């Protein structure tokens, strides 16, 4: 990971038409290779924030720089080569007549050669277990499959930054696990992963950094453990503890004070306690 931010915001403020303030004075530096969760209650500004990262929204005040490019003067098409965005609702970005067409559309827009289109589309569809359905119409897919198709269409572009907006919505357990394991693989390969989510179990298990939004402001920027130990932040935002952390808190009455966030951490803590 380098010290140079791939995403930089300074005094980022944004108001929707009608002077509805959605973001206020957000200062962030996100570096290449981070896995960042962006959390907060509905209306806290999470999705509005990440829509500034590929130019879908432009700051009312302040600025956003993506790999050094000021989004106010950079085309969305250029920013989309850096930041891939998978929307919460897959139907907002699916419009082709076959799974293959949808997954390869962005590559064709970039005028990539036929061999590269074939290879990258195939790899992306295999990664989300949709290659066998490549000739099917997207509307014939389940919602979970359409979510995976939307993910594949962005994966095919090989952008250095991947934004996942509620990535496991509508997914069964196996599909949820598959998408998150894919995010982990991309992160391990050096991609920057930003995950907007209400699911604190995902935050606890996968994120290395958490940005907490409240009323358009980033009120906390810390590790998952630090966030889930901060009762003031949890209470003021309505965030819930992940299930394992709840169990760990219940063990405090038995003299086990360690904050654990994942099942493996909890098992290790219990084994250590039993040995003493």
What are these regions (language model features)?
Residues 137-141:
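Conserved ABC ATPase signature
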Residues 62-70, 79:
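Conserved ABC transporter NBD signature motif
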Residues 54:
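Helix-to-loop junction immediately C-terminal to a conserved catalytic motif
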Residues 39-41:
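The feature captures the beta-strand-to-loop junction immediately N-terminal to the Walker
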Residues 162-165:
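Catalytic Walker B motif of ABC-type/P-loop ATPase nucleotide-binding domains
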Residues 115-133:
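Conserved ABC ATPase "signature" region
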Residues 215-216:
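Conserved ABC ATPase "signature" C-loop
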């Amino acid at each position: 990971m380098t010290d140079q931010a791939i995403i930089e915001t300074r005094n980022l403020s944004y108001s929707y038409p009608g002077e509805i303030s959605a973001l206020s004075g957000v200062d962030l530096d996100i570096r290449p290779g981070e896995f960042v969760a962006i959390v907060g209650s509905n209306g806290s500004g999470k999705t509005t924030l990440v829509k500034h990262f590929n130019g879908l929204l432009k700051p009312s005040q302040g600025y956003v720089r993506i790999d050094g490019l000021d989004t106010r003067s950079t085309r969305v098409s250029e920013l989309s080569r850096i930041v891939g965005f998978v929307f919460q609702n897959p139907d907002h970005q699916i419009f082709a007549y076959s799974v293959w067409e949808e997954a390869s559309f962005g590559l064709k827009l970039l005028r990539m050669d036929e061999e590269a289109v074939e290879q990258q589309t195939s790899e992306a569809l295999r990664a989300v277990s949709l290659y066998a359905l490549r000739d099917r119409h997207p509307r014939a897919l389940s919602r979970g499959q359409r979510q995976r198709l939307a993910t594949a269409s962005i994966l095919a572009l090989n952008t250095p930054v991947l934004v996942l907006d509620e990535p496991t919505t509508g997914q069964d357990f196996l599909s949820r696990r598959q998408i998150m394991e894919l995010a982990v693989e991309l992160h391990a390969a050096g991609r920057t992963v930003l995950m907007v989510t209400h699911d604190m179990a995902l935050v606890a298990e996968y994120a290395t950094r958490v940005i907490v939004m409240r009323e358009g402001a980033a009120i906390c920027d810390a590790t998952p453990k630090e966030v889930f130990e901060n009762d003031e932040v949890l209470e003021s935002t309505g965030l819930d503890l992940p299930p394992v952390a709840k169990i760990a808190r219940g063990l405090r009455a038995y003299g086990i004070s360690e904050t654990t966030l994942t099942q493996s951490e909890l098992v290790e803590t219990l084994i250590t306690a039993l040995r003493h």
